[in-house]
Amino acid sequence: MCVGIECHGFGDKPAWMDRGARQKAEAAKMKQKVTQVARNRRMNQFRDQNESSLNRIHNRRTSNSQPSTRSINNTTTIPASNNEPLALSQPPSASSQNQVEKDQLSTYHQDSINVAIDPLDTIDSSLPDFQTVFDEINFLTDQTFDLPEIDWTSTNNVPITDNTANMGVTNGLRAGQYVPRSQKQIDMDFSPRDSPSMLTISDVEDAALLAYYVSKVFHWQFRFCSSTMSGFNQGYFIWLMSKSRPLYLASLALSSSYRSFQNNAKEPQPCLKYEEHMQRYDIATEELQGHLKGHTPMNDVTMLACIVSFISSSFLHSGRIDGNVHLKAGVSLIAPRISRQQSGTLSDVHKTPEESSRDFLTGSIIRFDILSAITRDTVPSLSDSYRRILRSSSPSILLETVSGCQNWVFDILLDVYALRDWKRNTRAVGLLSLWELTAKANMIKSDLERRITSNLMLMNESKQEVKTQEDENLQSRHYKHEICVVTHTFACAVSILLEVIVSGAYPQVPEIKQKVGRALESFAYIEDPDILEVLTWPLFVVGCVVEEDHHECFRQLLSSTQLVRSIGLYGLKEILEKCWKSRETGEIKDESFDFSHFHTYKSREILIA
């Protein structure tokens, strides 16, 4: 490429190379010509890129049979300065759409020209070293002398940032992928306000609550989901949260309450004020109600997660958040799913994250529904459907991953509930047969005791394995042992419930006394006090029937410093005190004792689960 500089080849030295004024003047002209050529080349490159970009846009527009209008409606105008907010432009008419695109590209390239770096301009020509070096240049090359390729810098690869952190990733834009401004303006097909996938972390407090939820609250809610069998973990929950504003808000509210409870646990009388968290729960509840009106298959999963979070919150704010109401909503959501599952239309092989999450959260609802029936007058409405799932040889739902207790205990518990309702109904019409009652109870008892014996053997074996074998599978064996311990504790409590239904709540009756003693021994197998967090139901059953000599033992256990931070057991001591007082005063007779007497406490319904 000719730059208009005369080349003297290998001849005599030109007259102007006198190391004086003439040489400096000639050097200045050379510099000017080189600079001009560099600028011309840069402009040609910009022009070629402009035409190429327009061609790409034209091809993309003509290749789509139904061009999207939403992308233009949501086009983001880049502010002139960082202090100006992002503004959404008005949608152009169809006739001017092509001109808008050209103007946008023109603006983008003009900005690129303004910020482009001139390699020669970056050197200060006033410096002595520069002038000396330039003066010594001898263009003694052949006649085809050409300039080297000059690198240029544009804004194509400069990411456009926003001061707001967002959960979720937009279509066509992934973390770490830089998109030119023009492409981002035209292809952006979302509005943070309108898209449910974009959840704004509005301030540092929300970010702190989110981090606290992932590190602390999740483990409290789903202690046993760390197993690979659960098909669920923190990552899945965050993924669901990124798709649901109600779930995101409910999780932050729960995190706020949980953190406050833990901070106040050191007080002599820990008290959690709902008013401090009321605004968060109110907004989350409003969002949940709106989404329940028009749910989709994906919404079903996120709504289940949201409902489970509200049920967990009810243990912290039982006087303000009715867990039973949310549980009913959850049951109504899983009912169609369970109906399809028992017809064999669903497969548990190669589950997607959505399917795995749905099964896990469905198991959480089933767990709450079955256990809470202890204080209700009837069995769960979906008992038959639950049985089919729990008795499956390869169940897609494992309740041990949500409660630590295996499926067979919940299956037998449903049979015990059914016996309770049968006895109540036949007695009401004067047709109760004690012989028939005993026969039905013995069938359940035989199966239950056989299972307890088998699980006890597994528990002892797993204990020995944990003690004697230390390798990469130690954590898995420890998890297996914990499942056996929790399952044994629940099963012992179910055996007490069965005896109470048959004989009444007489602590001195040999059968009941023996079952209560075995249940108390089951608590001795627990090595980690945190496991008591999931044993509210067994502690409630055993505590209501235990002899008076053991009342003080329960008081000390539930008031111990190890359990003062236990949310699952929060308020259980007061409920047991009410039960003991009612029995001591004769308000509730042993022969007519029923756990449903304690479905309310301080004029509010309670949820034992």
From Swiss-Prot:
GO terms for cellular component: nucleus. Residues 51-84 have a biased composition (Polar residues). Residues 85-97 have a biased composition (Low complexity). GO terms for molecular function: DNA-binding transcription factor activity; metal ion binding; transcription cis-regulatory region binding. Residues 1-7 bind DNA. Residues 46-104 are annotated as: Disordered. One of its GO terms (biological process) is positive regulation of transcription by RNA polymerase II. It comes from the Eukaryota. It is found in: Nucleus. It holds the Pfam family Fungal_trans_2. Keywords: DNA-binding, Metal-binding, Nucleus, Transcription, Transcription regulation, Zinc. The keyword Iron does not apply. Transcription factor; part of the gene cluster that mediates the biosynthesis of meroterpenoids. This is Transcription factor ntnD. It comes from Nectria sp. The lineage of its organism: Eukaryota, Fungi, Dikarya, Ascomycota, Pezizomycotina.
